């Protein structure tokens, strides 16, 4: 734990000039306000720094927009991308009128999820380990006007460039679904990924590995260690910030969109998770795959509430272009040991109880990690409290099941609209505990429907011209 006094000493010792205060909006984008170093004192870590919240997506109107950012001293790191010495600090949001934590602040909701876990007596720590995939592109252009709509992405690694005159074209472009794990020269991003990883470490993220991913066109992944729920979400936001800015330094652009390329694998964010109490792991036992009853019930909660969960963990229309058969995506709601075709996988981790965990493979990195982790924890707790058994495991390759067998396995919603409908009909597991408020859930659903689902419904799609122009 870092104290406010230690942060203030760091500012003095490192001759920090600016303090960059970062917080997350409802959809999941980091926002920031930068202040001169002398504007921060010990009260900033309790009372906060005032700002106007009227323009923050999903928050307040202009008539009640005053809010305060409360600095978390445990999140301070020197920003490697700023010209002047700048200290970055992540904040949570308070209501200045009441001094209460703001119930639409995602980081506040994440803390309430931990408090809820403790209050149940089931555990005191929830560990999460997200694995967020992304694409590195050389060019990304898109536009939508009254009479046109298009997108165009390109990558030096794109298989579609095999016949392009690149003066000269040196080939070695990964075939579709064959980007995992060829060495250089097929893998052109080794040095960039290493710089990303080391920069993350300098920002306080406990790094592990980096590698190319399955898809052509520059799909990659960096790995960092699992952490407690809030710190894991903090690290994920730092991960995305570092990756995007290092790529920009190389003249490249990064997207965490689940499906930016047609015909190849999409990008997910598999989430490893477990519950501990008094420093001891609780998911190891003598049941299937070496799990405890608690772990199985947790899985039962995840699977029962999965359609509703996806309204939060897969919160974009693009999310459901990834969740389709044929691209190694977890479209079937089942669990299995080591089987990556199941939506919940129990990694093969030997007999060490500390390594026993589950991996929910549906989420993607368009999600707000604080909300996604909190929602998954609530679903798991509901499973434990109500002893929801997940049924029999599915240890066969789901992709090879016959249509008759597959029809018996529940599947993920086919669209964001259907996932939001499931969330509308099944969110008591989120609200009865007080972790999420009814106000938040209804605001979330309305925001997603009005600003995303309905906006796409209004606009012609380029492929519709291919299908229907000559009608």
Curated annotation (Swiss-Prot):
TM stretches of this protein: none
Cofactor note as given: Binds 2 Mg(2+) ions per subunit.
Annotated positions binding ATP: 208, 272-274, 340, 345, 354
Pfam families per the UniProt record, alphabetical: Gln-synt_C (PF00120), Gln-synt_N (PF03951)
The protein's required cofactors: Mg(2+)
Record key words, sorted: ATP-binding, Cytoplasm, Ligase, Magnesium, Metal-binding, Nucleotide-binding, Phosphoprotein
Modified residues (O-AMP-tyrosine): 399
SMART domains membership: Gln-synt_C
Domain GS beta-grasp: 14-99
InterPro entries according to UniProt: Gln_synt_N, Gln_synt_N_sf, Gln_synth/guanido_kin_cat_dom, Gln_synth_cat_dom, Gln_synth_gly_rich_site, Gln_synth_I, Gln_synth_I_adenylation_site, Gln_synth_N_conserv_site
UniProt binding sites for Mg(2+) 2: 133, 213, 221
Entry keyword annotation includes Nucleotide-binding: yes
GO CC, alphabetical: cytoplasm; membrane
Catalytic activity: L-glutamate + NH4(+) + ATP = L-glutamine + ADP + phosphate + H(+)
UniProt GO molecular function: ATP binding; glutamine synthetase activity; metal ion binding
PROSITE patterns linked to this entry: GLNA_1, GLNA_ADENYLATION, GLNA_ATP, GS_BETA_GRASP, GS_CATALYTIC
Subunit structure: Oligomer of 12 subunits arranged in the form of two hexagons.
Protein name, entry field: Glutamine synthetase
């Amino acid at each position: 734990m870092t104290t406010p006094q230690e942060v203030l000493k760091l500012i003095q010792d490192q001759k920090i000039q600016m303090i960059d205060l970062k917080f997350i909006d409802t959809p999941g984008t980091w926002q920031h306000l930068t202040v001169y170093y002398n504007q921060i004192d010990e009260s900033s870590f309790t009372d906060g720094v005032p700002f106007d919240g009227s323009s923050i997506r999903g928050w307040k109107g202009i008539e009640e927009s005053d809010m305060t950012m409360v600095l978390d001293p445990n999140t301070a790191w020197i920003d490697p991308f700023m010209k002047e010495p700048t200290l970055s600090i992540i904040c949570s949001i308070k209501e200045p009128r009441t001094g209460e934590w703001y119930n639409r602040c995602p980081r506040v909701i994440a803390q309430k999820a931990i408090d809820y876990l403790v209050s149940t007596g089931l555990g005191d720590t929830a560990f999460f380990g997200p694995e967020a995939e992304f694409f590195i592109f050389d060019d990304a252009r898109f536009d939508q006007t009254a009479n046109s709509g298009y997108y165009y992405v390109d990558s030096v690694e794109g298989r579609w460039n095999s016949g392009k005159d690149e003066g000269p074209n040196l080939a070695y472009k990964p075939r579709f679904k064959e980007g995992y794990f060829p060495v250089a020269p097929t893998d052109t991003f080794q040095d960039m990924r290493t710089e990303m990883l080391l920069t993350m470490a300098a920002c306080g993220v406990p790094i592990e590995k980096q590698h190319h991913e399955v898809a052509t066109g520059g799909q990659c992944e960096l790995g960092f260690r699992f952490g407690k729920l809030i710190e894991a979400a903090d690290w994920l936001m730092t991960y995305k910030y570092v990756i995007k800015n290092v790529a920009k330094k190389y003249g490249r652009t990064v997207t965490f969109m689940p499906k930016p390329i047609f015909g190849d694998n999409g990008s997910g964010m598999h989430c490893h998770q477990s519950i501990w109490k008094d420093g001891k792991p609780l998911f190891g036992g003598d049941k299937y795959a070496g799990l405890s009853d608690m772990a199985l019930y947790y899985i039962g909660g995840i699977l029962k509430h999965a359609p509703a969960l996806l309204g939060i963990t897969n919160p974009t229309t693009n999310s459901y272009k990834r969740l389709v058969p044929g691209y190694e995506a977890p479209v079937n709601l089942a669990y299995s040991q080591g089987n990556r075709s199941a939506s919940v996988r129990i990694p093969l981790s030997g007999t060490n109880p500390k390594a026993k965990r589950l991996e929910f493979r549906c989420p993607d990195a368009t999600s707000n990690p604080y909300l996604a982790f909190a929602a998954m924890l609530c679903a798991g707790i509901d499973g434990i409290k109500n002893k929801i058994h997940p049924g029999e495991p599915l240890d066969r390759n789901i992709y090879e099941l016959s249509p008759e067998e597959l029809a018996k396995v529940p599947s993920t919603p086919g669209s964001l609209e259907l996932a939001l409908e499931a969330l509308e009909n099944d969110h008591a597991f989120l609200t009865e505990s007080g972790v999420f408020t009814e106000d938040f859930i209804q605001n979330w659903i309305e925001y997603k429907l009005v600003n995303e689902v309905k906006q796409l419904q209004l606009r012609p799609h380029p492929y519709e011209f291919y299908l229907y122009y000559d009608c």
